[in-house]
Amino acid sequence: MQKQENLTKNQKIILDIIEKSSQPLKAYSILYDVKKKGINAPLQVYRALNKLVKIGKIHKIESRNAFIACKNSKCQIAKATVFSICESCEDVTEIHDHKLSEHLRDFKDNKGMKYNKYNLEFFGLCKKCV
């Protein structure tokens, strides 16, 4: 995984904003926050987001078209993510489960499928909202 000091200025700025957020952020919300720091074009934001996803610093929540920081310093999963999402407060938790990972790997092997990536999102109510 790429270290933060190897990131571009734009990537560092955007990563910092995402890491400080308690909720997933959409690209245009990020753009609004970074305009005062000299990042004015949506393309600049999307390039930085794509690179940060690729190197595993952030994850994309596909159903929300939003981004969160990877909280697991040992995360090696840039192409395979699993999240639980609260439908009430929209809290997102990244799930790290070795048994689930093994099951998905076995499923892939049994089906003879080569996945480029997968993103699983489980929806329900968190402990606070039940």
Enumerate the predicted regions with their spans.
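Short amphipathic alpha-helical elements of helix-turn-helix/winged-helix folds
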Residues: 13-21, 33, 55
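Short, basic interhelical loop/turn and adjoining N-cap
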Residues: 36-40
